[in-house]
Curated annotation (Swiss-Prot):
Cofactor: record remark: Binds 1 [4Fe-4S] cluster. The cluster is coordinated with 3 cysteines and an exchangeable S-adenosyl-L-methionine.
GO biological process: rRNA base methylation; tRNA methylation
Residues the entry annotates as binding S-adenosyl-L-methionine: G204, E205, S236, S258, L259, H260, N335
Superkingdom of the source species: Bacteria
Source species: Rhizobium johnstonii (strain DSM 114642 / LMG 32736 / 3841)
Gene that encodes it: rlmN
Protein name stated in the entry: Dual-specificity RNA methyltransferase RlmN
PANTHER family in alphabetical order: 23S RRNA METHYLTRANSFERASE, RADICAL SAM CORE DOMAIN-CONTAINING PROTEIN
Note from the entry: Reaction proceeds by a ping-pong mechanism involving intermediate methylation of a conserved cysteine residue.
Main location: cytoplasm
PROSITE patterns per record: RADICAL_SAM
Subcellular location: Cytoplasm
Cofactor(s), by name: [4Fe-4S] cluster
Length: 408
């Protein structure tokens, strides 16, 4: 049996068009939810109680149908159904790799984009954790030369609802809400939550969609709802320097930097945002990241490109650049994609690079590709519909997911 023969592919029922026309309560803050209920005639003295009820049903119980809210009066449920939705996005396709990696192709309404848009989310299970990679934009404004996503133009930002919906849907499909059963024969953590960690490493630059990302992550880490630990949430940025401090101050999650080069001339080519925010400014922003300590290190992502950035001189430059910054360095074997001019570094060279960094006192794990058989590894993600149309690229760095964030 071939690798591809072992993949399970399903296409669940599409989301109804009626639900697309109503505003979703998902992604609203408590204040916004209260204002929405007030506008529909809910008595002022009931607002706080109703918001608390809805918050619990949506984020603790994980319901996607108002009729399942059994402690909410029937007339209230009818009003909610008439004016709002808590439906999940349409699942166009679900794929399950033989290593347990899952990839969902999700479809959202146009919202100014001219047509419905699609994004992909990836779940990677390990023995002690399950990590979900989430997107913040449809497409990307950055044009990183080694990244497949850079070949797709930015279509639009995702809303807080759409960012959170990726997490809610994944927990639905994995049986990760109370009184839900996990799919049979599924590889996932033996104990605890199925989705224990999330990483903002999907399509797009999250710090170019700061407000929606902030709202979604504050809800995801709310102790009375989804209750994810901030130490288990990692936001990855290519280096939008002005928003880095705000991320630590206002969101308080773990930070990852897509570094990939230690010289400005090379990083200008690989990660063009470096022309606007060069390495000196980026590293200084990292040094002042709120909450930074040896227990809350910044992860620096470094894709290994043959004869480009993989020499021992580059390794020495990396150690010098990060001196004094509590850091972990993720070395990522490059996944070639059609049309790229880059190659992955030889494995022997990657190991030499890693050994040098380790000898300097930095943790430098080499990320093992996951989900390659369903094109879910770094630089490989692209929807089936996009492959057929070949007009846009849906790709993002998912191979770096494993082991991001703290363990406690």
């Amino acid at each position: 049996m071939s690798v591809m023969d072992e993949i399970v592919v399903t296409k669940p029922q599409a989301r109804t068009s009626a639900s697309l026309e109503k505003p979703s309560l998902i992604g609203m803050s408590r204040e916004e939810m209260g204002a929405a209920l007030r506008e529909k005639g809910v008595a002022e003295k009931q607002i706080k109680m109703r918001v608390s009820q809805l918050w619990n049903w949506i984020y603790v119980r994980g319901v996607s149908d108002f009729d399942h809210m059994t402690n909410v009066a029937k007339d209230m449920r009818e009003m909610l159904k008439q004016h709002f939705t808590i439906a999940r996005p349409e699942i166009v396709e679900e794929q399950v790799s033989n290593d347990g990696t899952r990839k969902w192709l999700l479809r959202f309404p146009p919202r100014g984009a001219g047509r419905p848009v699609e994004i992909e989310a990836v779940y990677i299970p390990e023995e002690g954790r399950g990590t979900l990679c989430i997107s913040s934009q449809v497409g990307c404004t950055l044009t990183c030369s080694f990244c497949h996503t850079g070949t797709q133009r930015l279509v639009r930002n995702l809303t807080a609802e759409e960012i959170l919906s990726q997490l809610l849907l994944a927990r639905d499909r994995l049986g990760d809400f109370p009184d839900r059963e996990a799919p049979q024969g599924t590889i996932m953590p033996a104990e605890g939550r199925k989705v224990s960690n999330i990483v903002m490493m999907g399509m797009g630059e999250p710090l170019y969609n700061f407000d929606a990302v902030k709202q979604a992550l504050l809800i995801a880490t709310d102790g009375d709802g989804l209750s994810l630990s901030r130490r288990r949430v990692t936001l990855s940025t290519s280096g939008v320097v002005p928003e880095i401090f705000r991320t630590g101050e206002e969101i308080g999650v773990m930070l990852a930097i897509s570094l990939h080069a230690v010289r400005d001339d090379l990083r200008d080519l690989l990660v063009p945002i470096n022309k606007k925010y060069p390495l000196k400014e980026l590293i200084e922003a990292c040094r002042t990241y709120p909450g930074l300590s040896n227990a809350r290190r910044i992860t620096f992502e470094y894709v290994m490109l043959k004869d480009v950035n993989d020499s021992l001189e580059d390794a020495k430059g990396l150690i010098k650049l990060l001196k004094g910054v509590p850091a972990k360095i993720n070395l990522i074997p490059f996944n070639p994609w059609p049309g790229t001019n880059y190659q992955c570094s030889d494995w022997e060279q990657i190991e030499k690079f890693a050994d040098f960094i380790n000898s300097a006192g930095y943790a430098s794990p080499i990320r093992t590709p996951r989900g390659r058989d369903i094109l879910a590894a770094c630089g490989q993600l692209k929807s089936e519909s996009e492959r057929m149309r070949k007009t846009e690229r849906l790709a993002f760095e998912a191979m770096m997911i494993a082991n991001h964030g703290a363990d406690d």
